[in-house]
């Protein structure tokens, strides 16, 4: 556990790997992206399709399905990750197509904003149903196809899965759960050749905050996200997570250095809290030695 926490310090960069593009001599690898209508999911869908991969794009509304179907290399699938019937139908559609399935991007998600003391249990339950049980349901249903292709499962987490802040309690809980989901599933599926990883975005432009406010009537500093960058870098990280030859377990993607530093410093604070005043605490020299050992296993950090 200590070595793992120390190794989180290494997550501020993408590394130098390049995703392998499909060649004309082979059928394009197929990937399912959930929550593909807007935001990160839409950027991931468009990026992968443009690179020549075949994308099954999950969405719920007719207009969104039509817009996704208009993109070359994309087949829209009606998919609400809280509905088992939708999941079963998606699995049947993908199986019948005969392309197999190489990748799953668990992207569909909702945010819940506001104090825990006044948030309804129904709102907390919705957050868990979409952000936690949704990926669990879908991943379980698609495992036979992913194992057959020795594919990859990439979940869109958040830096809120590393730290937590005021008014994002339920959302942060759900994203912390996805960190554990990723690590446990990676260990379970490694013997079958399936790689599991997680992309952890910081603050990027999306509709997730506005959707939460519209649903709950609670407006917070997270509601308007239009001032943030488009999630182009997040989509690039997802492509690497899916296709680079030696993928990382975690891809932290922040819009600027300040946010990256804040996240890593918070992780260091947690490490200090974990170590302090317990029977088997380590002194500074021992902690630095652990960090040095962890750094030796990581590729060199490329500075722009």
Map each language-model feature to its residues.
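Active-site helix of classical SDR
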Residues: 139, 174
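Conserved glycine-rich cofactor-binding loop
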Residues: 37-38
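Substrate-binding pocket helix/loop in short-chain dehydrogenase/reductase
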Residues: 115-116, 123-125
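Rossmann-fold cofactor-recognition segment
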Residues: 72-85
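Residue(s) in the substrate-gating loop at a strand-loop-helix junction
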Residues: 158
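Active-site-adjacent segment of SDR/Rossmann-fold oxidoreductases
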Residues: 163, 184-194
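SDR active-site lid
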Residues: 191-248
């Amino acid at each position: 556990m200590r070595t793992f926490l120390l190794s989180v310090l290494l997550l501020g960069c993408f590394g130098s790997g390049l995703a392998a593009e499909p060649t004309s001599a082979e059928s394009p690898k197929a990937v399912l992206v959930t929550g593909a209508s807007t935001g990160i999911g839409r950027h991931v869908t468009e990026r992968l399709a443009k690179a020549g991969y075949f994308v099954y794009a999950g969405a719920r509304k007719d207009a969104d399905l039509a817009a996704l179907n208009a993109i070359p290399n994309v087949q829209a699938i009606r998919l609400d990750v809280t509905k088992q019937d939708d999941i079963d139908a998606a699995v049947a559609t993908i199986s019948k197509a005969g392309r197999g399935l190489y990748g799953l991007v668990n992207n569909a998600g909702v945010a819940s904003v506001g104090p825990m003391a006044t948030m309804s249990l129904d709102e907390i339950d919705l957050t868990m149903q979409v952000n936690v049980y949704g990926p669990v349901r879908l991943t379980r249903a698609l495992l036979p196809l992913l194992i057959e292709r020795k594919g990859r499962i990439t979940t869109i987490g958040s830096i809120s899965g590393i730290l937590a802040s005021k008014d994002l309690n339920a959302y942060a809980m759900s994203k912390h759960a996805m960190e554990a989901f990723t690590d446990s599933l990676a260990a379970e599926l490694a013997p079958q050749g399936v790689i599991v990883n997680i992309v952890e975005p910081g603050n990027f432009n999306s509709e997730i905050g506005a959707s939460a406010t519209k649903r709950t009537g609670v407006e917070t500093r997270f509601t308007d996200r239009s001032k943030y960058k488009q999630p182009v870098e997040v989509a690039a990280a997802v492509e690497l997570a899916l296709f680079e030859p030696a993928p990382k377990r975690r891809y932290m993607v922040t819009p600027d250095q300040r946010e990256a530093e804040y996240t890593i410093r918070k992780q260091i604070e947690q490490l200090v809290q974990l170590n302090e005043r317990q029977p088997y605490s380590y002194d500074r020299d021992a902690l630095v030695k652990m960090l040095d050992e962890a750094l030796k296993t990581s590729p060199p950090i490329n500075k722009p």
